[in-house]
Amino acid sequence: MNLDHLGTPLRPMTRVHGKSSNRLYRLDTERGSFAVKALNPFDRRCTYHADDVFRFEQAAFASGIPMPEPISATPEVLVHRWVEGDRLPEAPVPAAFAFEVGEILARIHALEVEWTHASIREPAPRDWPELAEQAAATGQPWADELASHVDTFLAIANFVDTCERPGPVVVTHKDIQPWNLLSRDGRPVVLDWELSGPLELASELGSTALSVAKGPGFDNIEPVIFRSVLDGYVAQGGELPPSGPSWFVFMIEGWLGFTHWNIVRCMAVDEPPTGLDLAMVQEEVLNGLHGLPVMFGRLSELEGLLV
């Protein structure tokens, strides 16, 4: 990768390890410190529109959204100014933090940014019976568990494809999760914008509010924290969409696709040259097999958070 535009390195670029399939590095030059992300094309499940995303990031940064300054972007490499901050624990965030996340979302949705590419939604995967057979034939450690959940995953796919999504549609981050946030002086900083694009407002609010309001699993959801995100959104001038399952369908849809993707990867003859190692992929499969049926089974409880 050519990084000459960042200046003369003061020391070798260092790898920053994490669970992402992309590779993140820190580069220190006489012009400052930069986060250099090498995108992994083998794990890309949707088209990455580098120009649209970069233009959106520039507008967000110029408006004062707390985020790393975007420096450059290509379909292969993203560069941002390095920012310091604390990673969030896997637990509900403080109410004031959640409130500010809601405010940030409202400010993002108020940006007037042209998005030049149409959003195309693919049908949810329905080959779960075939995957269960392949998993058993290839001796996957979770084969029996997948087989026991085939009907559930088919029901989830049907829900994803038939759930009404009344809108409105906004251009937004689409992935404000605890692992894409830093806490700096107790306030949120939003990272990892590459999935940005058009999305139904309810889906963005629901996935964001739920993710910052809970710990591992779904037994520790704090309704006050969930509501704080929505209160912050309204306080900043946002208008809440109607209540309903559409608030959670995007989160379920994304998790379903991610689980399917990782199941296929586990059974591939050759591992891709980059991305998550096989052990981590197996872990993500188990997370989906355990968590998705639970979340789907609690949809009515989750909708209760909106009342």
Ranges and model annotations:
Residues 1-13:
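Juxta-kinase regulatory segment immediately upstream of eukaryotic protein kinase catalytic domains
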Residues 17-31, 35-36, 158-203, 214-216:
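Active-site acidic catalytic loop and adjacent metal/ATP-binding pocket
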Residues 28-117:
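ATP-binding pocket architecture of kinase catalytic cores
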Residues 41-42, 79-91, 133-139, 256-275:
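A glycine-centered beta->alpha junction motif in the catalytic cores
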Residues 91-146, 167-169, 198, 276-280:
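A cross-family kinase active-site recognition segment
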Residues 136, 258-307:
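ATP/Mg2+ or Mg2+-diphosphate-binding catalytic cores
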Residues 203-238, 252-271:
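Active-site activation/catalytic loop segments of kinase-like enzymes and analogous catalytic loops
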Residues 240-251:
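All-alpha amphipathic helical-bundle segments outside canonical DNA-binding/catalytic cores
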